[in-house]
Amino acid sequence: ERKIPYFYRKLASIETAVIKTIPLVSIYIPAYNCQDSIIRCVESALNQTVTDLEVCICNDGSTDKTLEVLEEHYTDHPRVRFITQENSGIAKASNTAVNMCRGFYIGQLDSDDYLEPDAVALCLREFFSDRNLVCVYTTNRNVNKDGSLIADGYNWPEFSREKLMTEMILHHFRMFTIRAWKITTGFNETIENAVDYDMYLKLSEVGKFKHINKICYNRTLHTENTSIKKLD
C-alpha cells in the first residue's frame, strides 16, 4: 500500500489524528536541572489539540533529578523519547534534540516553560496555508514559577527581516520546518550567547516567516537558564 507523505496530510484531520510511525510534528526540549518543571513542560506538549506529535528531550547532563523524573514518567511513553548527554550547553543540547526529531514541523520548547493547548494547531494552519513558510511564531506571556502572570511579552506586530537584523523579535512559541533547518548549519555550538538569534537569522535566509498575534506560550522568568554549560 502506497503511503501519502506525511507533510501532505489534510488539515482537517490534524486535530483528531493519532500518531503514525513518522509523526507530523516534533516538539524538542533541551533540558537542564529542571526536575520541578519538566513534567508540566512535557505534558503541555502532549496535551496539544494536535495529537500527531512526538516529544524529543535532550537531558544536558543535569545534576538534579531531571533524568530520574523522565525515567519514572516517560520511559514507556509512546510519544516521548529522551536521551542524556554530558553537559555541553544549550546549542549542542538543542542540536541533539532536533536531530532526534522525526516530524516535518519542529516546535521549540524550553524545559521550564509550557504551551497553551492550541499552539501547534495554530502554527500548522499557517504552514498549511502557505508552503513557502519556513517558520511560524506566536506571542508569549511571562510568568513566575507558579504560573502567575508577570506580564504579556513584548509583541512586534509583523515579521520584518530588517528588524530581525537589528534585534531578536521572534517570540515563543516557534515552529520551523525540518527541511529548512537542515539547510542551515543548525545551532552554533561555538557561541554561548544569542544561540537562538543566530539560528533564526540563518533560517530567515531560507524562506518566509509568519507571526501569529496570539499568546500561545508561557515563559517562566527566573535566575536559572534552561541549559547552561557548567563553569569549572
Language model features by range: what are they?
Residues 1-44:
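N-proximal low-complexity "stem/linker" segments adjacent to membrane-targeting elements
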Residues 23-26, 54, 198:
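Cell-envelope/extracellular polymer assembly enzymes that use nucleotide-activated donors
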Residues 43-52:
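Short, acidic, metal-binding catalytic loop of nucleotide-sugar glycosyltransferases
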Residues 44, 59-68, 88, 110:
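A conserved acidic beta->alpha catalytic loop
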Residues 85-101:
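Glycine-rich, basic loop-to-helix element that forms the pyrophosphate-binding segment
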Residues 106:
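Short aromatic/hydrophobic "clamp" motif used to bind/position activated sugar donors
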Residues 118-150:
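Conserved donor NDP-sugar-binding/catalytic core segment of glycosyltransferases
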Residues 158-232:
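Conserved nucleotide-sugar donor-binding catalytic segment
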